[in-house]
């Protein structure tokens, strides 16, 4: 079986016009000058005219051991370059493995050479091929109805061929395009007219809301300051200077005052969220000066300062009420 396969390899070598195709099979499969000469011939058939390697580098006295080593090394580099071996494998050039392994490697190389030679077409050019392809496409376009007709049956019956539907006329498409262009032009003119009548202000709605918020916060701040003034002048002397029994009768009023304080604290506690939200919204606003707080931010800061005073006063008032309730018990 192996001998028959080797005969087929040598037959291919004769068809490829290798001058020593009739050499003994052993000399082609095992290390020696006959094998190296065959591999050299096959490799340069694969490399072609634009080879980065030169056959002159392989010339030398075949009987000298150093020259033979250089030749084997050079063939191993070419084999790696061609992808025949993954690395520079000297043993592969000399031949290793079983008889079948050696024959398989040689057969693969011969098949590569055969495929590359018979696939070459010296008369072929890409320009001519492109011209032929264009002619084919033109012929298909001219005979479209015939190609997709039922007589030809080039496609299965369940395949829907979109091209069988009538195509719109080019002049009709141009007319519709012109009409759409006019509509677009009219719309653009209307947009330009509106823009000329009303100046575009991206911060318009934002500015109005900010103004309303500022007014409400200013009103609240005024109320908070007035309340602190009343507390300092009227309530504080009672809670700090009068004895516990003298607070009799102040309890119901104090409870109402405490409820008002708690509601006030709940409102003021949301000022931080209000300030953060305003800071996020005001980023990029044309009315915001870099490095300077806005009017809303300043008012919120003032309200927070008032909250600090209210917290302190509330603690004193709560302690007084708790003390009075303890005396009653």
Swiss-Prot record:
Highest rank taxon of the organism: Eukaryota
Name of the gene this protein is made from: AUG7
Protein's name in the database: AUGMIN subunit 7
Coiled-coil ranges (or none): 169-197
GO cellular component term of the entry, any: spindle microtubule
Main location: cytoplasm
PANTHER family recorded: HAUS AUGMIN-LIKE COMPLEX SUBUNIT 7
GO biological process per UniProt: cell division
Keyword Membrane attributed: no
Subunit (UniProt): Part of the augmin complex composed of 8 subunits. The complex acts on microtubules and interacts with gamma-tubulin in spindles and the phragmoplast.
Function text: Contributes to the assembly of the acentrosomal spindle and phragmoplast microtubule arrays as part of the augmin complex. Regulates the association of gamma-tubulin with the spindle and phragmoplast microtubules.
Annotated compartments: Cytoplasm, Cytoskeleton, Spindle; Cytoplasm, Cytoskeleton, Phragmoplast
Pfam families registered for this protein in UniProt: Plant_NMP1 (PF06694)
GO function terms (MF aspect): microtubule minus-end binding
Annotated keywords: Cell cycle, Cell division, Coiled coil, Cytoplasm, Cytoskeleton, Microtubule, Mitosis
């Amino acid at each position: 079986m192996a001998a028959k396969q080797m005969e087929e390899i040598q037959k291919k070598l004769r068809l490829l016009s290798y001058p020593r195709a009739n050499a003994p099979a052993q000399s082609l499969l095992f290390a020696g000058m006959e094998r190296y000469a065959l591999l050299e011939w096959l490799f340069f058939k694969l490399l072609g005219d634009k080879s980065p390697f030169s056959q002159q580098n392989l010339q030398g006295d075949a009987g000298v051991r150093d020259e033979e080593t250089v030749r084997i090394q050079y063939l191993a580099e070419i084999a790696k370059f061609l992808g025949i071996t993954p690395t520079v494998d000297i043993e592969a050039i000399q031949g290793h493995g079983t008889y079948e392994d050696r024959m398989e490697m040689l057969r693969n190389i011969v098949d590569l050479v055969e495929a590359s030679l018979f696939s070459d077409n010296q008369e072929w050019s890409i320009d001519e091929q492109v011209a032929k392809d264009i002619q084919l496409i033109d012929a298909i376009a001219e005979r479209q109805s015939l190609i997709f007709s039922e007589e030809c049956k080039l496609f299965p019956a369940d395949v829907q061929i979109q091209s069988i539907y009538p195509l719109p006329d080019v002049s009709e498409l141009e007319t519709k395009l012109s009409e759409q262009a006019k509509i677009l032009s009219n719309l653009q003119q209307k947009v330009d007219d509106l823009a000329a009548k009303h100046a575009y202000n991206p911060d318009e709605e934002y500015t109005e809301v900010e103004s309303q918020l500022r007014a409400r916060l200013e009103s609240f701040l005024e109320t908070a300051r007035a309340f602190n003034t009343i507390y300092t002048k009227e309530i504080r002397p009672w809670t700090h200077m009068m004895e516990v029994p003298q607070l009799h009768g102040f309890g119901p009023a104090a409870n109402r005052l405490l409820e008002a304080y708690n509601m006030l604290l709940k409102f003021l506690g949301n000022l931080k969220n209000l300030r953060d939200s305003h800071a996020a919204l005001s980023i990029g606003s044309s009315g915001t000066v870099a490095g300077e707080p806005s009017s809303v931010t300043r008012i919120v800061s003032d309200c927070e300062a008032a909250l600090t005073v209210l917290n302190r006063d509330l603690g004193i008032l709560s302690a007084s009420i708790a003390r009075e309730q303890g005396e009653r018990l």
